[in-house]
């Protein structure tokens, strides 16, 4: 009985694998081999560039809207109160 169940499961797995491997997916506008006809791509591009879009493109990018970053080196940090706390054992430049 165990042998028949094992053969049945193997046969079912074989059918599932063959079904997936032998079938070919055909999408609208696609030819066998994954190629598309040029006319349909051109029509799709024309449809996308209708000219009367509802979405507006923002004038500034998000990076331009951020405040600028000020990099502070040791010379600029002379009066900065945390300089002594960050480098307590520093004696100077060598």
Swiss-Prot record:
Locations listed in the record: Secreted
Keywords from the named record: Amidation, Cleavage on pair of basic residues, Hormone, Pyrrolidone carboxylic acid, Secreted, Signal
GO cellular component: extracellular space
Top-level division of the source organism's lineage: Eukaryota
Residues bearing PTM Pyrrolidone carboxylic acid: 24
Major place of residence: secreted
GO molecular function list: gonadotropin hormone-releasing hormone activity; gonadotropin-releasing hormone receptor binding
Key word Heme present: no
Glycine amide carried by residues: 33
Position of the signal peptide: 1-23
InterPro entries given in the database record: GnRH, Gonadoliberin
Function of the protein: Stimulates the secretion of gonadotropins.
Family named by the database record: Belongs to the GnRH family.
Record protein name field: Progonadoliberin-3
UniProt organism field: Rutilus rutilus
Phylogenetic placement of the source organism: Eukaryota, Metazoa, Chordata, Craniata, Vertebrata
């Amino acid at each position: 009985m165990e042998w028949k169940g094992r053969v049945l499961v193997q046969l079912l797995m074989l059918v599932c694998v063959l079904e997936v491997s032998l079938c070919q997916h055909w999408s609208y506008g696609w030819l066998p081999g994954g190629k598309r006809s040029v006319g349909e791509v051109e029509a799709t591009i024309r449809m996308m560039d209708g000219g009367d879009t509802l979405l507006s493109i923002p004038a500034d990018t998000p990076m331009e809207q951020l405040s600028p970053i000020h990099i502070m080196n040791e010379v600029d940090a002379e009066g900065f109160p945390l300089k002594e706390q960050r480098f307590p054992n520093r004696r100077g430049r060598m």
